[in-house]
Amino acid sequence: MTSAESARRHPRTGPPGPHWTPATVRPVSEPSRHGPRYGTVDTDYALRMAATPPEEDGPVWMVNLMKYREIADYGDDGESTISGRDADDLYAPFEVLADIGAEVVFFGDVEAQLLGDSPTWDRIGVVKYPTRRSFVEMNSRPDFQKKHVHKDAGMQETIVIGCLPVDLPVFETQNWAEVPHPPTDDDGPITVVHVLRFSGDSTADMDAYSLVAGEVAIPHGVRIHGWFAAEGTIIGDGRTWDQVRFNAFPSRAAFHAVATDPYRLAAQADHREPALADTYAMIVAPGLDALATSL
């Protein structure tokens, strides 16, 4: 990734926000007056989303980290015998998303969590909304709220990060049929998702690491499907984040070869670890990956 220094935290587009007054904001669908059970709404970010004129609004990518209940909990509405994952499948508001011009651009189950102790995430999803206003308005629609009952029942915990694309490093894309560990029926493509919070102004260290990681990973077929700057966390556990990165590998064997490379490991110790205050890293089996074409 020979121009990693261009991949800063700065987004490519302008500031967020629909032309709403703060008094009209309803940042996240509320199953009750106490708000959703699976996380805490960041009202400051919601207000920022609501404070910018329409001409300064634009697309936002909402990155969802999902942890399910073992058994869905519908509260007073009745005893449940389905899993939290199944309840989330019932939620899936595809019709609502299509109606407002939003689309799911990434979706997959977490196979392994490499970094970050708790929670252990189950799924990752990304929805691209045409504007921040469309995201806010969606949450007050009756048809969305009806479906949201299933999300509240199935979700134990979630983090939803509003993101904008950053400029990507430029490098030659390898033909996956010609790399040392090509995809096979038994070992197909994976996406490694990194959720990053930097330690102070430490992008220089992260850039230095990315240069080395790129030198190692490019011959093994890595493809950057999207790097994003976090503009806010609309719902979560109170932590803030700086970036989310989606790197695709042709196979698990290819990722393993990169992860265990001594040159990359030395750069990780010298640069990546000092650069980060908090992180998750997950191997995801993508069921849908249209991130690159959504940028």
Describe the residue ranges of each PLM region.
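A common structural junction motif
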Residues: 143-149, 263-269
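Short S/T/G/P-rich N-terminal loop/turn motif that feeds into the first structured element of a domain
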Residues: 2-123, 130-137, 154-266, 274-295
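Short, amphipathic alpha-helical segments
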Residues: 129, 138-145
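Short, surface-exposed basic-aromatic patches at helix termini and helix-loop junctions that form
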Residues: 140, 150-153
